Amino acid sequence: MSPKNNHDPSSSGDSGNTNVQEADLQEMEDVNNSLDALSCALDAVEQRTDDIMSQLRELLNSNREIRRLIAEENDNAPESGDDNMDGQAGSEAAPK
């Protein structure tokens, strides 16, 4: 924005000051409105970021739980799998 210089030395001092003050007030109001709009936009971005972070935490916890369950299944599977393998090997070896 360029500075507003409405001062005319030939005009009366009071009306010149009034015009400058009104222009300054209008410019400040415009800046204030722009700042309010930016604040609202930033609030929306912050809310969206919070929502995404919450979803990511839920996904992380879900993945951790699934990995824990898979690890438990894998820990239990070799024990029962070894028993079946031994049983199959013994029963196959007997008929031969």
Swiss-Prot record:
Domain of life assignment: Eukaryota
Coiled coil: 21-77
UniProt-annotated stretches for the region Disordered: 1-28, 70-96
InterPro entries found in the cross-reference section: BBLN_eukaryota (IPR005374)
Keywords per UniProt: Coiled coil
Polar residues composition-biased segments: 8-21
Biased composition (Acidic residues): 72-85
UniProt similarity note: Belongs to the UPF0184 (EST00098) family.
Protein name: UPF0184 protein CG14818
Taxonomic lineage of the native organism: Eukaryota, Metazoa, Ecdysozoa, Arthropoda, Hexapoda
